[in-house]
Amino acid sequence: MDFFEIEFLPEALEYLNEIPGKAKDKILFNMAMARSKKDPKLFKPLQNGIWYFRTQYFGNHYRIFAFWDRTERTNTLVIATHGIIKKSDKPKKSEILKAKAIKDNYFDSKK
């Protein structure tokens, strides 16, 4: 059973298209796993309603930022905003703010 659907915004798709084949496959596999089971190692909350998908592959730490859209009662969406290859222990505040701005713009455009 899937807990949510994932919708990729253009920047998230661009990021995924730049990732080499097997790493991209692992990212997509982990995202599919996160949809079907609640695992904070795969999908973790940050702040201000921003979450991120986590994948480690051959020493690289891939992150795809996302937020929840529960406006439709029939379908819970997770909107993937953009991604980074993590180089430090914590996600940069600027990346969280970027995801928050994308989230705000997304909901403003739905009004």
Predicted regions and their residues:
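Basic, Lys/Arg-enriched alpha-helical interface segments
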Residues: 1-61, 70-78, 85-111
